[in-house]
């Protein structure tokens, strides 16, 4: 009877020990992922800007308050080149860029491709711009965890998370090879960063 009780006690101890080890491993893995997301967000968010466009030719401040389109953009060079979506731009319109340091600057369109909905704009500023580290979209896999950074509803830069749901989406347009994600993307996020 005593021997049977010792065996049962040992089983309970082993099971509890396994549960504790599993929980520690799970918490450590979760913490590593959380830290990776935090580090990636902090690194990338300084490279994301807000894009305001208008056909208004008045001052920067009135242009900001009369903006027709609001979206996001990503700094891709320290010379002030920013990539965004071309649907945000108004033909012959003004472009205003809101930076993470609170500064505003004017931008000019360098080029755009409406078929792929991509535009490059340039701005000149007195402060150092931090370009994002550009990845290789051909290495993205379905199920990869990603972060979307942008300015939804013009409430300020935000980070949302999700996974890659699909790759190579073209929606009937042979120019496109879109990446689909389930990360929350709302009006104002257009042109923002999708990072992994």
Predicted segment positions?
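Serine-dependent protease modules
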Residues: 26-196
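N-terminal Lys/Arg-rich, disordered targeting/topogenic segments
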Residues: 1-9
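Hydrophobic membrane-insertion alpha-helices, especially the h-region
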Residues: 14-26
